[in-house]
A protein has these predicted regions:
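N-terminal, positively charged nucleic-acid-binding surface of large information/translation enzymes
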Residues: 23-228
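Intrinsic disorder at enzyme termini
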Residues: 532-593, 607-628
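Intrinsic disorder/low-complexity segments
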Residues: 1-25, 582-616
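Structured secondary-structure scaffolds
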Residues: 27-73, 125-129, 172, 195-433, ...
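Hydrophobic, well-ordered secondary-structure elements that form the walls
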Residues: 361, 477, 513, 529-531, ...
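Phosphate-backbone binding interfaces of nucleic-acid-interacting proteins
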Residues: 607-731
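Short, glycine-/Ser/Thr-/acidic-enriched flexible segments
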Residues: 38-39, 177, 221, 264, ...
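Helix-rich, typically C-terminal accessory recognition domains appended to large enzymatic cores
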Residues: 407-443, 453-558, 688
């Protein structure tokens, strides 16, 4: 275990630093910004990059607005999954996480994500801060211990987290369901409820054993958390959807949180409790502060070692802003603020939550080649292109972002190449050919007014960036780019260049056009930093602030223009998708479930990259007689309605036309696989018509829709031939 000081790739250090002092009366802010920690058990993929790009854009924009920002992240490096994977690969957990850290930092740096410090949760700084918070909670009477019964793997001699146990659902009897809930019918249960449970690690039948566990009494903080929620809501630090979800959890009651795991486990041992380790979700968020401590100790960004205490004390005026995905809301808005408050420390200023990434309208898929790792993308396409496309879709809500490959290609080619870069490419040559590479010394009144209007319009982008409404900012930028291109087209400098009497007018047209280009570049810089840097090199300047855009740049030399961006070739996208299929074939080293820790908000692993492979999955089920099969009344149903179920993260509600049987309402646990349920309307599906109706808190489910796959996002509805009619029996 060590500090990650001195190991950070240069790109993580080159864009950062404290903003200059502001002399214009603007209130400047000092902000610590974090992204959720990637789990050190797999590669970074484009789903991860959505968040890292979102937070990096925000940090860059806030710095260009004049604020001081410190930007940190780390690998989440603890847990049973890492311990078991290291064992399977024949290396130590430390060696495993070190190799993953190097790959993660390289991927992030190559995407232009400029962390001031990128650490690991397996550091001395994190151990010390985690112990400090735990001991403060304990001293305050907010912890307790009690015996719990858990399933134990007698072969591996270890207690099994819920996600390491599979078996038959006690309700719908679907096979190979995880120990915390059925992904087919949506029922929540404990591992002890499973029928014929087995260990995902060894395949052995688990035994029920008792162990002492440690808990944080979350109910102690209910009043504080409700007050914090109200304050953050009123200050814009929590989105409405998050507030609504928190209120649901409050209504259900806050239960004590089990924060311990038994040896063997890779993590931090609880002080004074040999053989007991902190659950990964205890030390993971503390990793934000540990990474910041290491940054303070380094002396970079104008920080000093004692600045950590200034930042984390309860009355700190600095801000702490987290960017996370919607699957880990529970941990960041209940456990984390409670832990901090209980330790006498400051709570988060804002928790900014984003939706999931889909590709071509569906969940990322290994078989379709749309489960794309960051490195695979980088091997084929420019990272600024993805940054821009994500920006055109990112809004302040929890809406999912779809990477539609056709739209991606068209938007990049049209907006970045056709609208932005095109302005400079059409005018720069004339400045060098006729005017010695120098812009005009002044602009006439009409042109000055036109520039001022464009600059004023784009100044609204500062507030849009701050509000994380990047999509609106990009629309405004494209609008001004269209106006600039219309100006160039209307004046046709290529025609003016043929008439020597129009040289002065040509100089004015090219100067205004290139200032439009500069204006757009300044406002695009947080989104496409590498391309913007090349554009600024061409313009021979490096503006650090948005307010540099308010005045045109005149009577200065520019450099020779060279291509700043090229159009995306469809073949490159196709090659990337093919490479994704190849890089994720079964012969790759995968193996144990990547995350045993389900999020209470969603019931799914908060750090999962690839679905677990059951060692018993290939074992055939016991044979049944034809009479047993004949008991099932399988029918074709036509989907009349399909939508999300409020209050459930797993279920979709179907209304089927079942022919002579009338209409059937069925709740199906396939939400993870179908994020756009409205697209299922009109489809034929196969369902069990004679399953006893089941009363759920959402309504009565009148059957079961059949699907193929291993569960979670790997589920695929069974189709019936187009000739099949609603209500027809399936033989």
């Amino acid at each position: 275990m060590q500090s990650r000081q001195g190991e950070i790739p240069a790109v993580f250090l080159g864009e950062s630093g404290a903003a200059p002092c502001d002399n214009r009366g603007m209130t400047t802010r000092e902000i610590l910004v974090t992204s959720a920690l990637p789990y050190a058990n797999g590669q970074i993929h484009l789903g991860h990059m959505l968040e890292h790009i979102q937070s990096d854009i925000w940090v860059r924009a806030m710095r260009m607005a004049g604020h001081t920002v410190h930007f940190v992240c780390a690998d989440d490096a603890h847990g049973s999954a890492i311990m078991l994977r290291a064992e399977k690969e024949g290396i130590t957990p430390e060696a495993l996480i070190d190799g993953v850290w190097k790959r993660h930092t390289a991927d992030l740096a190559d995407f232009g994500v400029a962390y001031d410090h990128y650490s690991s949760t397996h550091t001395d700084a994190n151990r010390e801060l985690t112990a400090r918070i735990w001991l403060a909670l304990k001293a305050g009477g907010h912890t307790e211990s009690r015996p719990v019964k858990q399933l134990y793997d007698p072969v591996k001699a270890m207690f099994l987290p819920d996600r390491y146990i599979k078996g038959e659902c006690p309700k719908c009897h679907s096979k190979d369901q995880y120990g915390d809930g059925c992904e087919v019918c949506g029922t929540a249960y404990t591992p002890a409820d499973l029928i014929n449970p087995y260990s995902v690690v060894s395949g052995a039948t688990p035994e029920l054993k008792e162990s002492t566990h440690f808990f944080v009494k979350l109910a102690d903080f209910e009043t504080m958390l409700k007050d914090w929620l109200a304050q953050r809501r009123d200050a814009g630090g929590l989105q409405a959807e998050v507030v609504n979800k928190l209120q649901e959890w409050f209504a259900d009651g806050l239960r004590s949180w089990d924060v311990s795991r038994d040896a063997p486990y890779f993590g931090f041992e609880i002080p004074g409790e040999p053989g007991k380790f902190f659950y990964v979700w205890v030390d993971a968020p503390v990793g934000y502060l540990a990474a910041f401590k290491e940054l303070c100790d380094s002396g970079r960004n104008g920080l000093k070692p004692d600045d950590l205490e200034r930042f984390i004390r309860a009355d700190s005026t600095a801000e702490m802003v987290h960017f996370i995905g919607k699957d880990i809301i529970y941990f960041h808005t209940l456990f984390w603020p409670a832990m901090l408050h209980g330790a006498g420390l400051r709570t988060p200023t804002a928790v900014n939550v984003h939706g999931f990434l889909t590709v071509n309208g569906a969940k990322m898929s290994k078989s379709r080649g749309t489960f794309i790792e960051a490195r695979t993308y980088l091997n084929h396409l420019d990272p600024d292109y993805l940054r821009y496309f994500f920006a055109t879709q990112l809004v302040p809500s929890l809406a999912d972002v779809d990477l539609d490959m056709k739209a991606f290609e068209e938007r990049v080619n049209s907006h970045l190449v056709g609208k932005w870069v095109n302005i400079a490419s059409r005018c720069a040559g004339f400045v060098h050919k006729f005017f010695g590479g120098k812009l005009a010394a002044q602009l006439p009144a009409d042109e000055s007014a036109a520039y001022a209007a464009a600059a004023q319009k784009l100044s609204a982008c500062a507030a849009l960036y701050a509000a994380r409404d990047y999509a609106a900012a990009m629309r405004l930028i494209v609008e001004v780019a269209d106006e600039a291109n219309a100006y160039v087209a209307a004046n046709a400098p290529w025609t003016m260049a043929k008439d020597e009497s129009k040289r002065d007018a040509l100089h004015v047209v090219c100067t205004l056009a290139l200032n439009y280009f500069r204006l757009l570049t300044i406002w695009l810089a947080p989104v496409v930093p590498a391309t913007a840097a090349r554009a600024f090199a061409f313009l021979d300047e490096t503006p650090a602030r948005f307010d540099a855009a308010m005045q045109p740049r005149l009577n200065v030399a520019i450099r020779e223009f060279s291509a700043l961006a090229t159009r995306i070739d469809t073949k490159k996208i196709d090659a990337m998708i093919e490479a994704s299929k190849e890089s994720l074939q079964p012969n790759a080293p995968a193996t144990v479930p990547p995350s045993p820790q389900p999020s209470p908000a969603s019931g799914r692993g908060g750090k999962t990259d690839v679905a677990a492979t059951s060692p018993a999955a290939s074992t055939p089920s016991p044979t049944i007689s034809i009479d047993d099969f004949a008991k099932l009344d399988l029918r074709v149903g036509k989907v009349l309605q399909c939508g999300f179920v409020e209050g459930s993260d797993k279920l979709l509600r179907f209304v089927l036309d079942a022919g002579e049987l009338g209409q059937r309402q069925i709740f199906s646990g396939i939400r993870a696989a179908y994020q756009e349920p409205e697209k299922l309307i009109g489809r034929n599906v196969v369902f069990i018509a004679n399953l006893a109706p089941r009363k759920m808190r959402f309504g009565v489910s009148e059957g079961m829709i059949l699907s193929a796959g291993s569960g979670g996002n790997d589920l695929h509805l069974l189709d019936a031939d187009a000739g099949a009619k609603a209500g027809m029996p399936v033989k």
